[in-house]
Swiss-Prot record:
Assembly and binders: Probable peripherally associated component of the endosomal sorting required for transport complex III (ESCRT-III).
Positions in coiled-coil regions: 22-153
Name of the protein described by the UniProt record: Charged multivesicular body protein 5
Protein localization: Cytoplasm, Cytosol; Endosome membrane
Organism this protein belongs to: Xenopus laevis
Keywords carried by this UniProt record: Coiled coil, Cytoplasm, Endosome, Membrane, Protein transport, Transport
Gene3D superfamilies assigned to the protein according to its UniProt record, in alphabetical order: 6.10.250.1710, ESAT-6-like
Membrane disposition: Peripheral membrane protein
Protein role: Probable peripherally associated component of the endosomal sorting required for transport complex III (ESCRT-III) which is involved in multivesicular bodies (MVBs) formation and sorting of endosomal cargo proteins into MVBs. MVBs contain intraluminal vesicles (ILVs) that are generated by invagination and scission from the limiting membrane of the endosome and mostly are delivered to lysosomes enabling degradation of membrane proteins, such as stimulated growth factor receptors, lysosomal enzymes and lipids.
Biological process annotations from GO: late endosome to vacuole transport via multivesicular body sorting pathway; protein transport; vesicle budding from membrane
UniProt xrefs under InterPro entries: Snf7_fam
């Protein structure tokens, strides 16, 4: 059948805005290069005219410069038009992409809302309240157990008057213990003599014994 009717050609996808922008930008860059070459020619003609005298030759160079300048103006107009087209397509492309992003965001929010509804269905408020009540009861039971364990047994009753009397007596005993008069007596006792008994010195300051002879130092 393909031999008789021929095989259909695959459909070529239409160009996107991005493709069109790339194409237009490429054309604008090509025109910009042409403008740069014309600028170089204009500079060359201008330098020639500065060195030439007035006359037919200078007029001929001037006419060439005017033609080049005219071409430059045309190219500049084309470049500006292409740049404007590229800008418009970029704005349209930006708007389209923004709408796509918005749709994606809305779809994600819808999915999130569905998931939240499912999660809320699995959570029972009554079960949470029952759980809170159970926890509160267990805490009360734990407190009662602690109070029971800390209960004291066989503790005699103590008279407050007896405690105050004992406290007053304890204060007197502490005052007696704080008496430091014995320290004063120890401080007034005669000092311990220093040096060796019966030591004396002659007029030259040499230590002598009881017979007045110089002492031999011990080695």
């Amino acid at each position: 059948m393909n031999r008789i009717f021929g095989k259909s050609k695959p459909k070529v996808p239409p160009p996107t805005l991005t493709d069109c922008i790339t194409n237009v930008d490429g054309r604008a860059e090509s025109i910009e290069k042409k403008i740069s070459r014309l600028d170089a020619e204009l500079i060359k003609y201008k330098d020639q005219m500065k060195k030439m005298r007035e006359g037919p030759s200078k007029n001929m160079v001037k006419q060439k410069a005017l033609r080049v300048l005219k071409q430059k103006r045309m190219y500049e107009q084309q470049r500006d038009n292409l740049n404007q087209q590229s800008f418009n397509m970029e704005q349209a492309n930006y708007t389209i992409q923004t709408l796509k992003d918005t749709k994606t965001t809305v779809d994600a929010m819808k999915v999130g809302a569905k998931e939240m509804k499912k999660a809320y269905k699995q959570v029972k408020i009554d079960q949470i309240e029952d759980l809170q009540d159970q926890l509160e009861d267990m805490m009360e039971n734990a407190n009662e157990i602690q109070e029971a364990l800390s209960r004291s047994y066989g503790t005699p009753e103590i008279d407050e008057d007896d405690l105050e009397a004992e406290l007053d007596a304890l204060g007197d005993e502490l005052l007696l213990d704080d008496d430091t008069s014995y320290l004063d007596e120890a401080a007034s006792a005669p000092a311990i003599p220093e040096g060796v008994p019966n030591d004396s010195k002659n007029k030259d300051g040499v230590l002598v014994d009881e017979f007045g002879l110089p002492q031999i130092p011990a080695t």
